[in-house]
Amino acid sequence: MAKIQKIKGVADLFPEDSARYAFMEKTARDVFSSYGYGELRVPILEKTELFCRSIGEETDVVQKEMYTFPDRKGRSLTMRPEATAGIVRAYVENKIYQPGKVSKFFTFGPMFRYERPQAGRMRQFHQIDAEIFGAAEPQADAEVLLMLSSFLSNIGLEKLSFELNSLGCPECRPKYNQALKDFLASLDREQLCDDCQRRMDTNPLRVLDCKSKNCKALTENAPTLPDHLCGECREHFDTVIALIDEAGLQYTLNPRLVRGLDYYQRTAFEVTSGDIGAQTAVAGGGRYDGLVESLGGPKKVPAIGFACGMERLAMLLEGEFEPAADFYVALVDERAAKDSLIFGEKLRRSGLKGEVGFTAKSMKAQLRHANKINAQKCFIFGAEEFENGTVTIKDMAEGGEQETVSRDEYFK
């Protein structure tokens, strides 16, 4: 019978890989909780309308990348391509909003997009996501950036680049959009890729987000958003910059940074690395003050957040992440199988972590496995130990000592 293999674009995460993800999740919990964030878990499946209304009908995500299907009652459902929309939906549906109330959430989990699989880009991928609602002040933008920086630093990633821009607001964006349309109209339309030709009519800002080298070259002299900001947006962005300058965060202003989702306005940012190939962005986010209202919530609820791609971060992490075992119980004589199993259970009940050998093997093979799991100590059950009610304890450090003691005395 033929083997059943995993589908294209997904991965099996074995213990050595899962340990990296667990390390990132634990670090995120520790860092985010220190800023007052609480964990929120939202469904993987949502109504398709949620993403059409939030991400934008004309975005590549909605047009080409979502896993969407009808359920048995004909309702259109989508496996979430990102986390923010689901968190906003939960925020609105559960009426968490109150005047003056600031709410902070984080979440982890798998997301799904139908993309061409490559290093750092999978069809099922994992994100760490953080969002804050109810804070319009630039201090919130600065705190989000500093919290993201703290998380990345705490997982050992220092050589990353922060890029920032302001995308304006509904007051100043239309003037910029017109200036951009006028510029794009001056280009030879046929020289742009098919996607950008479509975007010129539906969402001109997305042209600046194109990854095609040819499109980037053609739009190199396009007008920039920072040159078209209204007074309030300029003041907001200048204050954000002043705050992160004071905090010592290193960054670069990138006037071409627009992000790939329609809901962003004002502050937008990306974190990039030059060490993971073509997919350089490892995190990104921004402010989305109009999204709560567009999903049925009250008007003018400010919000800002970010997401980190765990697959891409995992590619940058160095070192071993599987925790060392406290012990390994080596079964050398089959007669001691019951005694060794019970001894290992007592060790675990005392707060230690480790394994018990189920099959009698040579001492050499047992020690090899103890070294493989980085056990601190090896408890040996051979013929002599079985007959005398003892256990031999070997310190697995190089040149470690070995001693034989009574099993009954060991736990006293």
Curated annotation (Swiss-Prot):
Q: Keywords for this entry?
A: Aminoacyl-tRNA synthetase, ATP-binding, Cytoplasm, Ligase, Nucleotide-binding, Protein biosynthesis
A GO BP entry is: histidyl-tRNA aminoacylation
Look up the coiled coil feature and give its residue ranges.
none
Q: Which SUPFAM superfamilies match?
A: Class II aaRS ABD-related, Class II aaRS and biotin synthetases
Q: Name one Pfam family in it.
A: HGTP_anticodon
The protein's assembly and partners: Homodimer.
- Family annotation (PANTHER family): HISTIDINE--TRNA LIGASE, MITOCHONDRIAL-RELATED (PTHR43707:SF1), HISTIDYL-TRNA SYNTHETASE (PTHR43707)
Q: Which HAMAP family match?
A: His_tRNA_synth (MF_00127)
- Protein name as catalogued: Histidine--tRNA ligase
Native source organism of the sequence: Maridesulfovibrio salexigens (strain ATCC 14822 / DSM 2638 / NCIMB 8403 / VKM B-1763) (Desulfovibrio salexigens)
Give the organism's phylogenetic lineage.
Bacteria, Pseudomonadati, Thermodesulfobacteriota, Desulfovibrionia, Desulfovibrionales
